[in-house]
């Protein structure tokens, strides 16, 4: 099924095993990691839905093992490192708006549509029964996955003995049900002493190549390397000096980096989604 000239590209990725030393983790943190990984898999599930228009169907049972691996790595039949060209025969070029917008929607139609949240990071654009455009918030469109993820984050929060992490997990759990992420983002920035970390939810907007309005779901489950993080601490004090020496006009250097900025090193134990 993969085009003959694309077969060589199935060899461009090398598998890497993600590992970390968990011997120094508390028993509570060891229990939390599998829960966070389970939550992350739901972000993967959503990203598949965001990436692939419903009108494009692929019979994955017809793919060889090598083809299926390449398909899985790319989250669909388009080669992400080759201009999103289709690598499966008979599949058209990927729509610029992925699955965030109807594939038959024109820019003129979208721009003429008077809808306040159409540019929101957290809405899917669909058509009503009468063919007119409607927006559906992520917390409704992905209600099943968001609810499950929220429950898992709350479960992890109950186990955690780190008050900052507990607070962040609970706020992120609530955010997934409301699509209001600011408070949990601030709580994440405020964490200082946590060993376990998770980035989760709709964050980057690169998947929407039509407008760049829509966020894609992703997750990283992380374990902080405290030894290396301590080594990086000394560089925080250099940030103002480094900024002052940037080769740009003074107006671009007016905002000084805070002395409470953090530089940390992490081992990634799980990636999911965008």
Where are these regions (language model features)?
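N-terminal helix-rich structural modules
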Residues: 2-168, 172
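Contiguous, non-catalytic segments that form substrate-binding/exosite surfaces or channel walls
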Residues: 138-141, 145-274
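General structural signal for secondary-structure boundaries
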Residues: 1-2, 106-107, 225-226, 232
